[in-house]
UniProtKB/Swiss-Prot annotation:
InterPro entries: 4pyrrol_synth_GluAld_NH2Trfase (IPR004639), Aminotrans_3 (IPR005814), Aminotrans_3_PPA_site (IPR049704), PyrdxlP-dep_Trfase (IPR015424), PyrdxlP-dep_Trfase_major (IPR015421), PyrdxlP-dep_Trfase_small (IPR015422). Belongs to the class-III pyridoxal-phosphate-dependent aminotransferase family. HemL subfamily. Pfam families: Aminotran_3 (PF00202). This is Glutamate-1-semialdehyde 2,1-aminomutase. The gene is hemL. Its cofactor is pyridoxal 5'-phosphate. CDD domains: OAT_like. The modification N6-(pyridoxal phosphate)lysine is found at K271. Keywords: Cytoplasm, Isomerase, Porphyrin biosynthesis, Pyridoxal phosphate.
Length: 437
């Protein structure tokens, strides 16, 4: 392994990939379009580190976009995956491990009385919307600009994550009818929610919101915002769906619910509960969940739902995630966020470093960011040189200013110090940047 140097093999892989894979990647943000340069093709990961196909090693601040709270290739997770795979990779039949996962989630989040396992966070939110519409017999959904809930057609309007990264208002292929059934409101604006319910209340099936927004950069909910959403929805016969795909079991042992226990009607999960393998889940009130087939008439199914290898990886991750693990996650995030603030402050560059638990991100702006308009109004052109200065020094942050930074409990002092050593040059690169054109 070497310090970051050549990217020749990654460049060759990228060229080869573009011949057969649209854009050369299987998820848009991976293509480095927002930061420029060659995306790094990864060969392996261990603890807090990634190694690319050129042999360069990086401290990882992406962590597979959130699932890897224990770090890469944690021995307990690897052993669980190996043991499960040796028993069979898929059965198309129920397993006891699925029950254990459902029980573990319900134990951690008591508001989740029943749960259904699926294959991705997108599938979880898609299914939760179908269930909410069936339960209420209403068509409309309220979402918030900048919140990302996967690539569900009805939820891609003014979405965060890759949609924000690519500067898209939405996406072709979403029909006007689907878009018309989605009411998009400013995040953290409870008055806008009240106004929407005054106008459309009898037609709104649910409000869906990230438990803490982290796909337009990290924008935590204002105190009481999620609770007010629940109150307004319930006053009008609608449901609240809390999307914990990203925050679930990362920001605490009970996810965001552990920090702000708002009893939503439905929750969605993913990422951590798969330990790095594909999985998702949605759950909530028993009377709502029992509408799902075969108990009820709302159809939802999946060939690989509850996959035994993914469930094994997720259970191992959850069982290894002791209070000390969460304390380490919080400590590392706090150290890095403080260092970013100090370095930006020392150089006098306008900035906001915002946190939601151990999630954090940088905004190049003078005022705290509360919503999507403010997030997209920042000097985002400062991020590419900032990113590449870190990458050149062996630190791999997210390749978009609109994504959260993720740490793991495997980020030891050596890894943290490598990040701290890289920050001065990165902040200087951001300060020296000039707007395009």
């Amino acid at each position: 392994m070497t310090s970051p140097g050549t990217d020749a093999v990654s460049a060759a892989c990228f060229e080869r990939a573009r011949a057969r894979i649209p854009g050369g990647v299987n998820s848009p943000v991976r293509a480095f379009r927002a930061v420029g340069g060659t995306p790094r093709f990864i060969q392996s990961g261990a603890g807090p580190y990634l190694v690319d196909v050129d042999g360069n090693r990086y401290v990882d601040l992406v962590c597979s976009w959130g699932p890897l709270i224990l770090g890469h290739a944690h021995p307990a997770v690897v052993a669980a995956v190996k043991q499960a795979a040796e028993r069979g990779t898929s059965f198309g039949a129920p397993t006891e491990a699925e029950i254990e996962m459902a029980e573990e989630i319900a134990r951690r989040v008591p508001a989740v009385e029943m749960i259904r396992l699926v294959n991705s966070g997108t599938e979880a939110t898609m299914s939760a919307l179908r269930l909410a519409r069936a339960y209420t017999n209403r068509p409309l959904v309220v979402k918030f600009a900048g919140c990302y809930h996967g690539h569900v057609d009805a939820l891609l309007s003014a979405a965060g994550s890759g949609v924000a990264t690519l500067g898209l208002p939405g996406t072709p292929g979403v029909t006007p009818g689907q878009a018309a059934e989605t009411i998009v409101l400013p995040y953290n604006d409870i008055d806008a929610v009240r106004t929407a319910f005054e106008r459309y209340g009898g037609e709104i099936a649910c409000v869906i919101v990230e438990a803490a927004a982290a796909n337009m950069g990290v924008v935590p909910p204002e105190p009481g915002f999620n609770r007010a959403l629940a109150d307004i929805a319930h006053e009008n016969g609608a449901l609240l769906v809390l999307d914990e795909v990203l925050t679930g079991f990362r920001v605490s042992s009970a996810g965001w619910w552990g920090r702000d226990p708002v009893a939503a009607d439905l929750f969605t999960f993913g990422k951590v509960i798969g330990g790095g393998l594909p999985i998702g889940a949605f759950g909530g009130r028993r009377d709502i969940m029992q509408l799902l087939a075969p108990a009820g008439t709302v159809y939802q199914a999946g060939t690989l739902s509850g996959n035994p290898v993914a469930v094994a990886a997720g259970l191992a991750t959850l069982r290894e995630s002791t209070p000390d693990i969460y304390a380490r996650l919080d400590h590392v995030a706090a150290v890095l966020a403080r260092a970013l603030r100090d370095e930006f402050g020392r150089i006098g560059l306008p900035h906001q470093v915002q946190q939601a638990g151990n999630l954090f991100s940088v905004f190049f702006t003078t005022e705290p960011v509360r919503n999507y308009a403010q997030a997209t109004g920042q000097e985002a052109w400062r991020y590419p040189p900032f990113f590449h200065a870190l990458l050149d020094r062996g630190v791999h942050p997210p390749p978009s200013v609109y994504e959260a930074w993720f740490v793991s409990a495997a980020h030891d002092d050596a890894a943290v110090n490598q990040i701290l050593d890289a920050l001065p040059a990165a902040v200087r690169a951001a300060a020296d940047a000039r707007p395009p054109g």
